[in-house]
């Protein structure tokens, strides 16, 4: 067997994913009639001598020397024939040193997974800009995660929720041009602002309002604007009689707001009309077995969709930020098993559609929106990211589905970017009309630094992160302060 790979820093794509290439038999110096990796992949189990005896018969060549090679590799790697185990640093180093041999053994699942990640890394080294290498690999990994789920679960349709599902949808559709999965895609314009009034079918349901949004980040006037679709004509006058309309609420006045609005401001007939408007928009997009995708984080929109449409749906989100989704009754799956350190606006601004944010629905089921202007930096990153997705699709084609890698690993570069460069790249984030602001949850605008008070006491944040945290809080309440600082 030829050692043509050696320990090159950057392999070409065909070398990196040798298992998927038609000329692999030539590079491995085997019989011209035998595609050994594809042939080897048909046999599973621990009885290697028997497997290689049968392989030799099929290939018409003596392949028994490879049996000992694979046995030694398995012994060193401790790779079971029909299972998956995480790699240690020592095993990963061994993989790098023995890359050429490992490409021939498709039974070594962890090796295949490693090769898939190496293919992504090789593409990233073509262009190390954050849009291409970081955001591009992130979109590709999320789209491949969804593609595998679609194939495994047989969804008839995947609906991507606006607006942070837009570019994941674009990536999924670009990959599906070569994967050809029998699935339809849709784009559902919904937001926290549009969905908020739909969570109060009855006046008594308003008691849950403080649990749905951070009311202390609002004034009675701003909160009434969010509840306008279900508010009576005299709601403002009733609130103004007892509360200062332009002063932020505290823990006491928020309950006064709930009491007053529930007794004097809620209009059940307007709710029925608004629900009818929303159903007219949503129902045509949810038929059969469906899946939805959203970045996160608490399944608020998905819960409303399921209640209004009664559809059989599974929600796919990047991660959750509390245990609230587990109490909502909507089946869901997450890409990340834990919440990342940096999320919310820091993540979403790179995924947002260059279009209007949804703020409601009219009587004809049409969407009401409010436009924004994304920063030129973010727009360029999004363009570069889609180039990465297109390059992966064009390079590997339908074989993408056979590329074993953990999507979480493919997202690592973007997570690193969020830690180190997102604030600089997203300095113009205040230009965006963010869905977090629209949904009445100003805390969503803060950067997600996942530490509880107890964790901060045991492991204090570094100075640079504390400064970032303070800057993020200023951004939530005074966007212009960031511009002045920068």
Task: Report residues per predicted region.
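Long, low-complexity, Lys/Arg-enriched
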Residues: 38, 57, 75, 82-485
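Flavin-dependent oxidoreductase catalytic core characteristic
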Residues: 2-79
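Non-Sec secretion/translocation targeting segments of pathogen effectors
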Residues: 1-4, 484-486
């Amino acid at each position: 067997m030829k050692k043509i790979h050696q320990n090159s820093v950057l392999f070409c794509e065909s070398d990196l994913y040798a298992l998927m290439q038609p000329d692999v038999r030539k590079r491995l110096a085997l019989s011209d009639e035998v595609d050994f990796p594809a042939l080897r992949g048909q046999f599973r189990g621990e009885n290697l001598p028997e497997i290689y005896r049968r392989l030799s018969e099929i290939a018409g060549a003596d392949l028994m020397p490879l049996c000992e090679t694979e046995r030694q590799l398995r012994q060193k790697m401790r790779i079971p024939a029909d299972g998956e185990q995480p790699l240690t640093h020592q095993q990963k180093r061994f993989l790098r040193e023995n890359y050429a041999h490992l490409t021939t053994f498709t039974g070594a699942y962890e090796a295949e997974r490693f090769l898939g990640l190496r293919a992504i890394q090789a593409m990233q080294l073509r262009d190390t800009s954050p849009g291409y290498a970081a955001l591009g690999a992130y979109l590709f990994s999320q789209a491949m995660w969804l593609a595998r789920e679609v194939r495994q679960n047989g969804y008839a349709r995947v609906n991507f929720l606006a607006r942070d599902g837009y570019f994941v949808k674009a990536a999924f559709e670009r990959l599906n041009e070569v994967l050809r999965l029998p699935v339809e895609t849709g784009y559902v314009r919904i937001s926290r602002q549009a969905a908020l009034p739909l969570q109060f079918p009855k006046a008594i349901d308003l008691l849950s309002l403080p649990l749905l949004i951070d009311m202390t980040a609002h004034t009675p006037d701003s909160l009434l604007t969010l509840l306008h679709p279900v508010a009576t004509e005299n709601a403002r006058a009733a609130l103004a009689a007892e509360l200062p309309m332009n002063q932020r609420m505290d823990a006491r006045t928020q309950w006064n707001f709930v009491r007053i609005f529930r007794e004097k401001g809620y209009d059940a007939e307007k709710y029925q009309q608004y629900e009818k408007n929303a159903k007219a928009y949503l129902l045509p997009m949810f038929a059969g077995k469906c899946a939805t995708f959203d970045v996160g984080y608490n399944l608020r929109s998905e819960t409303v969709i399921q209640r209004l449409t009664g559809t059989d749906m599974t929600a796919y989100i990047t991660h959750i930020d509390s245990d609230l989704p587990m109490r909502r009754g909507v089946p869901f799956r997450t890409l990340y098993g834990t919440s990342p350190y940096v999320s919310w606006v820091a993540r979403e601004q790179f995924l947002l559609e260059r279009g209007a944010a949804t703020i409601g629905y009219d009587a004809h089921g049409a969407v009401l929106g409010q436009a924004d202007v994304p920063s030129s930096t973010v727009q360029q990153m999004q363009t570069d990211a889609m180039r990465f997705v297109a390059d992966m699709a064009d390079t590997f084609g339908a074989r993408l589905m056979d590329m074993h890698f953990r999507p979480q690993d493919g997202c690592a570069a973007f997570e690193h970017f969020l830690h180190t460069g997102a604030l600089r790249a997203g300095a113009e984030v205040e230009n965006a009309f963010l869905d977090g602001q629209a949904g009445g949850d100003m805390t969503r605008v803060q950067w997600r630094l996942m530490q509880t008070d107890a964790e901060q006491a045991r492991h204090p944040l570094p100075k640079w992160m504390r400064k970032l945290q303070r800057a993020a809080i200023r951004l939530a309440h005074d966007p212009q302060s960031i511009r002045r600082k920068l």
